Amino acid sequence: MKDRNDELKDIVKEKYSEIANQSKQQNEISCCGSTGCCGDVDYTIFSEKYDTLKGYNPDADLGLGCGLPTEFAQIKAGDTVIDLGSGAGNDCFVARALVGDAGKVIGIDFTEAMINKARENAKKMN
């Protein structure tokens, strides 16, 4: 019998796998995205524009993040960056542009579907 923690992990994996497998048009936006899920509260302040950043890949932008973590991380050329919960790779691709050839970016995600999506997106960028 599964305990509550395992049940919750399964729910999270299932939901994010569904999102990874949806088309961009079908994708439901998270609370931090442009439409929000949490009533009348406007969360669009978190929905910063990635599309002006070097390394941005629109196919990797599933609207699941909050803000632009790469702007606050003080990433420099040659750094090693680890992105936990990397999803389809959006922040990883932006970070890769910042660290350059001398750096390294590692994306880690909980779901195999998101990892596969990130790999597909990475192939499009090479």
Predicted regions and their residues:
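Conserved alpha-helix/loop element of class I SAM-dependent methyltransferases that forms part
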Residues: D40-T80, N90-L98
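Charged, low-complexity surface patches
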Residues: N5, L62, T111
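Feature targets compositionally biased, intrinsically disordered low-complexity regions
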Residues: C32-C38, L62-L64, A102
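A broadly tuned "polar low-complexity/structure-edge" signature
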Residues: V12-N21, S47-T52, G63, G100, ...
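Class I SAM-dependent methyltransferase SAM/SAH-binding core
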Residues: D59, A77-N126
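N-terminal auxiliary segments of SAM/dcSAM-dependent transferases
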Residues: M1-V41
